Amino acid sequence: MGRSFEVRKASMAKTAGAKIKVYSKYGKEIYVLAKNGSSDPDMNLPLKHLIAKAKKDQVPAHVIDKAIDKANGGGGEDFQPARYEGFGPGGTSVIVDCLTDNGNRTFQDVRQCFVKTGAKIGVEGTVSHMFAHQAVFQFAGEDDEIILETLMMEDVDVTDVELEDGVITVFAPTTEFFKTKTALNAAFPDLTLDVEEITFVPQTTTPIAEEDSEKFQKFLDMLDDCDDVQQVYHNAEL
């Protein structure tokens, strides 16, 4: 895994249209976390982390504030998480996470992305067992041993710490996300976390043949165009 884990999500072009989609995805997720918990980030750690992540991705403050205000207002949409799994073009393994207020619509939208690219949507558990659901932190560094020792001293249940090409990657159970982040920030105040998220890390990767690469990119683009799709994880070697 290490640096090559790349949190295999669909990349988004830096166009105005793509930015609007990013803002919409963050706005929806912030709204859900604020509505289902406290709208005060200091009282809701997942919300606090998501807001920090949104700011890092240059989501405007008014988008964040609007989502929180909407949650405080009560009513509104009732979004539920939905996850779909299957095999993408080239035999790749794919997990699609959504937030939806209409499960039937979302399923049909996601299914069409699979069907129109010759992919095959499966049932729950079809490919998720091929991924590790983990907290991942990545930052520049050269001494992975001191990182491991520090986290162990703080009683963090670390899964693995890897060093590759001057980049350190820390893997931990999802339940240890905030404990790991707090320990890293406390021990290394000047540390810049380039990646800090809970994600699906593929246990193995699948090379994409040249004849499948265009179809696979079309598949990702179609999923990106689905309003309800929040994240796409895959094991393709692009």
UniProtKB/Swiss-Prot annotation:
UniProt keyword annotations, A-Z: Cytoplasm, DNA-binding, Transcription, Transcription regulation
Keyword Metal-binding: no
Localization, UniProt: Cytoplasm
GO cellular component, as recorded: cytosol
Lineage: superkingdom: Bacteria
Keyword DNA-binding assigned: yes
A Pfam family hit: Transcrip_reg
GO MF annotations in UniProt: DNA binding
Gene Ontology BP annotations: regulation of DNA-templated transcription
Family per similarity comment: Belongs to the TACO1 family.
Listed PANTHER family: TRANSLATIONAL ACTIVATOR OF CYTOCHROME C OXIDASE 1
Protein name listed in UniProt: Probable transcriptional regulatory protein VS_II1504
